[in-house]
Amino acid sequence: MIHFAKMHGLGNDFMVVDGVTQNVFFSPEQIKRLADRNFGVGFDQLLLVEPPYDPDLDFHYRIFNADGGEVEQCGNGARCFARFVRNKGLTNKHKIKVSTSNGKITLRLERDGNVTVNMGVPVLDPSKIPFNAKRVEKTYLLQTSSSHAMETFLCGAISMGNPHCVLEVEDIEHAEVERIGALLTQNERFPKGVNVGFMQVIDAGHIKLRVYERGAAETLACGTGACAAAAVGQLQGKLNKMVRVDLPGGTLTINWEGEGNPLWMTGPAEHVYDGQIPQ
């Protein structure tokens, strides 16, 4: 049997599996079946804890979307990852260093039960997002065709270990997240697809956000999306260094000292239950 934990970060839910003490492998088809909320465990992403490839690190962190595809980063998942490895006795550290397929991050368990994640330095270089553009801009013009004919969107583009585009909206409640998100997530200017954030600026220290995630549609919360929105808003001169981000599933705090500096995200990580499935 394979033992797992069901966890969530602000309603963004995960199946978390210990690949350190268990020998596990999941095919994309298996992940799709397990992600099904009627016939499987049901989750937005599967998180796999693996031994480190670098002796200076504690673990390797892998993330799989509900469609079975592996992705580079998940901020809400990172907080759950930290809580999981502590709960399962895989480490007794309060500060945990892990690698992902796209870099390294540091996780810190706080006294109040929250987890703070050093999400690394936001990537603005279009070639590294990846995003097809000639140079770095604070705002890009995206054009796309649909049944609504040609549409144009203004967005910020950034990578937090995974690609994001961020659109500002006047009213988050009435934003066309499903339609526009589905339209932009596979836009040809993003060769690896993109997560699409819809940001309403309340004031310089507070935004509301909804995110259409690549491979998972809209989720209750997206940690990297919150980081991307806070960074884009700051670069555009609309937000402070510390920002409260309200998502449908709850609130995150983002702290960024600006270009060239790592971005820090703080929020909860909740354990729901432990389970097991056949090998």
Swiss-Prot record:
Q: Which reaction does it catalyse?
A: (2S,6S)-2,6-diaminopimelate = meso-2,6-diaminopimelate
**Site (Could be important to modulate the pK values of the two catalytic cysteine residues): residue numbering on this chain:** H164, E213
PROSITE patterns this protein is in? DAP_EPIMERASE (PS01326)
Query: What's one GO MF term for it?
Result: diaminopimelate epimerase activity
What Gene Ontology cellular-component terms does the record carry?
cytosol
The EC number(s) attached to this protein equal 5.1.1.7
Biological or metabolic pathway of the protein:
Amino-acid biosynthesis; L-lysine biosynthesis via DAP pathway; DL-2,6-diaminopimelate from LL-2,6-diaminopimelate: step 1/1
The source organism is Shewanella woodyi (strain ATCC 51908 / MS32)
Active site per UniProt? C74, C222
Q: What is this protein called?
A: Diaminopimelate epimerase
Q: Which family does it belong to?
A: Belongs to the diaminopimelate epimerase family.
Site feature: Important for dimerization: Y273
**Pfam families given for it?**
DAP_epimerase (PF01678)
Q: What class of enzyme is it?
A: isomerase
Q: Which residues bind substrate?
A: N12, Q45, N65, G75, N76, N162, N195, E213, R214, G223, T224
Location(s), subcellular:
Cytoplasm
- Key words of the record: Amino-acid biosynthesis, Cytoplasm, Isomerase, Lysine biosynthesis
For this protein's source organism, the top of the classification is:
Bacteria, Pseudomonadati, Pseudomonadota, Gammaproteobacteria, Alteromonadales
Quaternary structure? Homodimer.
* SUPFAM superfamilies found in the cross-reference section: Diaminopimelate epimerase-like (SSF54506)
State the superkingdom.
Bacteria
- So what does this one do? Catalyzes the stereoinversion of LL-2,6-diaminopimelate (L,L-DAP) to meso-diaminopimelate (meso-DAP), a precursor of L-lysine and an essential component of the bacterial peptidoglycan.
